Amino acid sequence: MHVRNRNVDTGMRFRSRNADTGIIILENKSRNKEYIESLREGERINEIYLCKVKQSALTKAGKPYDTLILQDKTGTLDAKIWEPGSVGIDEFDSLDYIAVMGDITSFQGNLQLNVKRVRKVQEGEYDPKDYLPVSDKDIDQMYEELKGLIASIKEVHLKKLLESFFVEDADFEKRFKFHSAAKTVHHGFVGGLLEHSLSVAKHCDYFAGCYPMLNRDLLITAAIFHDIGKLEELSTFPENDYTDDGQLLGHIIIGTEMVGDRIRTIPDFPKGLASELKHCILAHHGELEFGSPKKPALPEALALSFADNIDAKMETVREIFNNVPENNQEWQGYNRLLESNIRRSGKL
């Protein structure tokens, strides 16, 4: 295989400090970072990545090797260390930032990095923003827009409930702003939970204007709260993985409990209104087979399930097309969430 060395492009070089220890130093020079989405088969790379997963295994012949999942803000990359004990392979763990040198190959149609050298890097050698997927929208601006919707709520108990989370609780605000809405499916990035919740709430606001039978205050409140349980279902970045409660209970149950617990602290909160709000959260996936404990039995619950489905699927399409040139109209392959193959439409 022909390997094209990227040292010239990146200005980044490994050199051995001691031939016996195999300690390697990454020389920091002015360079452009090589993101995972830009990597191509046949290239040699010297780069820093977040090691999201590190697992040891054995080949069929009984030889030990390490399998890694490397991450930056553009995606993930499978990597293998075929000789873990060799010179130039330093000790590191999952969730460490590591400098790697290796060759990009292909396995079963997917890119894979064959790691030749690796070391754990120290703070100051990397910028965390390069390694975590982040919303391309302004997070503070989105949060202010969300608070604007909260300010528009007229029902005093619902407004108090919303404000107790989103206005009066600084720790909650910080968590909600930066949390992901999913592990992989859609909005799986820093700010994803906020972006998705705001978008769903805006869709619901539109629905309320189209259909006067809808209780706007109930619908908007349910939309803002519908995925609040993901704060406990998913761990924070860089892990962004399911917690024990996430596996055992799921975000729908967790979120309903979070809202129910806070409702009990608000004097004279109407019992019927509390039940309707919790029903909307419980039913927001729309169908039992999609994970909802209840099917929508209120028009607001039905509208919320539509809004959630619209935003999840349109974001999935956006993320698919985000990695495809604008003039590319090729079919992108079957997508599980969309239950369809998809391509860009033609331009007039």
List the model feature ranges, each with a label.
Residues R13-F14:
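Intrinsically disordered, low-complexity segments enriched in serine/proline and basic residues
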Residues I24-I45:
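OB-fold nucleic-acid-binding modules
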Residues K54-P64, L77-D78, P84-D130:
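OB-fold single-stranded nucleic acid-binding module
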Residues T67-D72, T236:
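Short, acidic/hydrophobic/Gly-rich beta-strand patch recurrent on exposed beta strands
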